[in-house]
Structures are given as C-alpha cells and as structure tokens.
Amino acid sequence: TTTELDIDRGWSPVPMAAFGPHVLTIGSMSKIAWGGMRLGWIRAEPGIIARLLAVRPSFELGTALLEQCIAIELLDDMPALLGHVRERLHAGREAVAAGVARMDGLAMPTTPGGLSTWLDLGAPISTRLARSAREQGLILPPGPRFALGGVLERRLRIPITLTPERTAVAMDRLAAAWTAVRDRTVDDALPLQPTAVI
C-alpha cells in the first residue's frame, strides 16, 4: 500500500483492518524504503494471521535474513524514515509540477502522496506521447498499460520518486516529446515495444 506515503495532508489514516475482523491489509517496505526490498506485512485479526502462518511453509521459500534485519532497523525508526521519504517525494512532485508548468495543454492533478502522478493530456494521445518520449530517450509506459480498453489514453503516469535533478532532465525530454506530438511530427507507424514500467 502507499498509505504511509502521504506528503502534506498531515494525517495518518486508520488501517482498514481496524474496521472489521475479516479485513486484511498489506504493507510493503518496497514502497517505503527501497523498491528492491521485497518484504511486507499483513494486518489482520490474530486468527486469520494464525491460519496464514500455518499454510505459509507450503508456498514460500522464506525471506532473506539480511533484508529482515534491515527492515527491523528501519521499522524501529519509522517516523524518521517516513519524514525522509516525504521530503524526497515532495521535492520530486515539485520538480514534476515545474516541468508540467512549461507545457501548454498538460494538467497535473493535486497529488497529496504516493509514488507518481497522472498527468491529464487533454486528449487520447498517451500512446503517441510515450512513443515520442522514447524518441527523446525517456521511457514511460502509456496510460493504457495500466487499464483495459484504452481507458487511460488521456493520462500519463509520471513518477515523483526521482531527485529533482533527474526529474528536470526527464521533464525536459517530456517537453520535447510533447512539442513533437502537438506539432504532429511523431511517427505513429513506429511500434511501441513492451517496456519496463517506471
């Protein structure tokens, strides 16, 4: 979940598991600390946790001890870790907003937290813009990669997790891609190859 990744609302929601004995919520260190840290947790009532623990050995090989030790250290000082993460996300969000402000026709919604923002392109051109961005050396998946039936063709997902310096470079490339799309100089015949999602 990204519940812990609030940037500036200043409140901590009650975990969904608090609203009923049959609700499970899942958290992850990969969202809070580092994407390569594949550790998480489940919040649920003790009986459900006991049943999950009973079947766990049948489908899991275990988690690396080093990562578990690192997670324990990080969890011991979660407020400081989350403070650092909020500062980083705030800086990344501001860098994206500064880049978007230079591109006529793009809109960035209020983004109070999370790892990314979804730009409103104003038209169903996300795939064309992703193709144009690739020509500028910027790999971004088009909106429909995240939904069925072309639903997000008017949106483009932009991460707010990078440093302001790296984000500024990415936004410069996106601006060049945006200009090419608006000037209709993008080769629509060029196939958009599968890419890793960033």
Regions found by a protein language model. Give the residues of each.
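Active-site pre-lysine segment of PLP-dependent enzymes
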Residues: 2-32
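Conserved core segment of the aminotransferase class I/II
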Residues: 24-87
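Conserved glycine-rich beta-strand-loop-beta hairpin in the small C-terminal domain of fold type I
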Residues: 72, 89-97, 107-120
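Short, conserved active-site loop motifs that form the nucleotide-linked donor/cofactor pocket
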Residues: 23, 106, 138
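Short hydrophobic/aromatic beta-strand micro-patches
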Residues: 43, 118-122, 159-161
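PLP-dependent enzyme catalytic core of the Aspartate aminotransferase-like
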Residues: 135-136, 150-198
